[in-house]
């Protein structure tokens, strides 16, 4: 963290990471890798083929197929996905 700020203070060029799919630029490789998932959509539903960038989004989508509703209201007991 400190190296990043010290390099900037000394006038050195900051390293940047560009997305090959769009024009977005990031200051860390990790941030770029997370962004690239929005283009590659690596989490694919085996039932319908719909693709998602994050596993938890796929998990929520799977519930549309299974009908699972793991969350319920404490007051009325109505269930939600």
UniProtKB/Swiss-Prot annotation:
ZnF endpoints (C2H2-type):
1-5, 17-39, 43-65, 71-81
Keywords annotated in UniProt: DNA-binding, Metal-binding, Nucleus, Repeat, Zinc, Zinc-finger
* Entries under Gene3D superfamilies matching the protein: Classic Zinc Finger
User: What are this entry's molecular-function GO terms?
Assistant: DNA-binding transcription factor activity, RNA polymerase II-specific; RNA polymerase II cis-regulatory region sequence-specific DNA binding; zinc ion binding
**Which InterPro entries does the UniProt record give?**
Snail/Krueppel_Znf (IPR050527), Znf_C2H2_sf (IPR036236), Znf_C2H2_type (IPR013087)
Record's GO cellular component, any one? nucleus
Write down a Pfam family by its short name: zf-C2H2
Keyword Transmembrane helix annotated: no
Q: Which domain of life is it from?
A: Eukaryota
| Primary residence | nucleus
* Localization per Swiss-Prot or TrEMBL: Nucleus
Q: Which family does it belong to?
A: Belongs to the snail C2H2-type zinc-finger protein family.
Name-wise, this protein is Escargot/snail protein homolog
| Biological source species | Apis mellifera
Task: Show the taxonomic lineage.
Answer: Eukaryota, Metazoa, Ecdysozoa, Arthropoda, Hexapoda
């Amino acid at each position: 963290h400190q190296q990043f700020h010290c390099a900037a203070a000394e006038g050195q060029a900051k390293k940047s990471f560009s997305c090959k799919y769009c024009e977005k630029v990031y200051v860390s490789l990790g941030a770029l890798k997370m962004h690239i998932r929005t283009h590659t959509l690596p989490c694919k539903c085996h039932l319908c083929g719909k693709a998602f960038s994050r596993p938890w989004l796929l998990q929520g989508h799977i519930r549309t197929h299974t009908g699972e509703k793991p969350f319920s209201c404490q007051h009325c007991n109505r269930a939600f996905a």
